[in-house]
Amino acid sequence: MTLQQQIIKALGAKPQINAEEEIRRSVDFLKSYLQTYPFIKSLVLGISGGQDSTLAGKLCQMAINELRLETGNESLQFIAVRLPYGVQADEQDCQDAIAFIQPDRVLTVNIKGAVLASEQALREAGIELSDFVRGNEKARERMKAQYSIAGMTSGVVVGTDHAAEAITGFFTKYGDGGTDINPLYRLNKRQGKQLLAALACPEHLYKKAPTADLEDDRPSLPDEVALGVTYDNIDDYLEGKNVPQQVARTIENWYLKTEHKRRPPITVFDDFWKK
C-alpha cells in the first residue's frame, strides 16, 4: 500500500460522494450521539463566516431541529458562537452565515481582551510572543470560550475538521483542533462545497479564499499560501488521483510532520514518532 493509499484510508476519504447522502450521514451521526447521551442538551460551535463552520453549523441546526420534532425535547439547542478578535474583517460574511444557519441561539465573545491579557502576563514572566504563537493563542482562546459555554449549557463542542485540513495538520493543537465531535471528518474541501450547494447556501460563503486569519503581520493570509499547495491539489490527492511529484511530496511532508496533532498525547506505548 502506498503512502497516499494509507493516508486516504486513515482519513476515511472517498473519491466521490452523493451530497444528499453525506448530509444525512452527518445529521444522523449528530442525532445518534445526542440520543446516546441524553444529558447533552446543546451543540456549541464557533462561526467564522467561512465554508467549514457554515457547513458544520447548518448540519448541527438540522440535527437539533429534527431531534426536537421527533422527541418533543425542547431543551435541545444549537448555540452559534461569534468569536471575533476586535473587529472582524469579513463581518458581513459571518452575518450571512448566521442568517443561512438560523441558529437557536447566537452568542458573541470578543477574544481580544483575553488574548492581550494572556500575552501581557507572559511578557511579565519574560516570554515575548511571536506573531505566529499569538495566532495560536487566539485559536486556543476561542476554544476555551466554547468549552466554557458548553460547560454551562450541558453541551459538547463541535469541530470543523475535515480530510483536507487533517491531512496537513492545518489547525492549532488544542485550539480549533480540540473539539468533542467532528461531523465533517472524511470530506475534502470540494465535497464540503457540494454539501453547501445542496443546502442552498449563498455561494460567496464557500467560494471565498479560505483563511485562518490568525496572524497580525499577515492578515487574511490564504490557507493555500501558508500550505504551499492548493486545496484542489489536496482534494485530488485525497481522491486517489495522480498529482505532480512535488505536490505529493509537500502534502505527505505536512502529513508526516503533523501526525502528533491527529493523536492523543504521546505515551510510552506509541512508536509512530520513531518511524
UniProtKB/Swiss-Prot annotation:
Ranges that cross the membrane: none
Statement: the UniProt record of this protein carries the keyword Nucleotidyltransferase: no
Origin superkingdom: Bacteria
CDD domains named among the record's database cross-references: NAD_synthase (cd00553)
Signal sequence coordinates: none
Keywords: ATP-binding, Ligase, Magnesium, Metal-binding, NAD, Nucleotide-binding, Phosphoprotein
A GO biological-process term: DNA damage response
Residues involved in Mg(2+) binding: 52, 165
Pathway the protein contributes to: Cofactor biosynthesis; NAD(+) biosynthesis; NAD(+) from deamido-NAD(+) (ammonia route): step 1/1
Subunit and partners: Homodimer.
Protein name per UniProt: NH(3)-dependent NAD(+) synthetase
Primary gene name: nadE
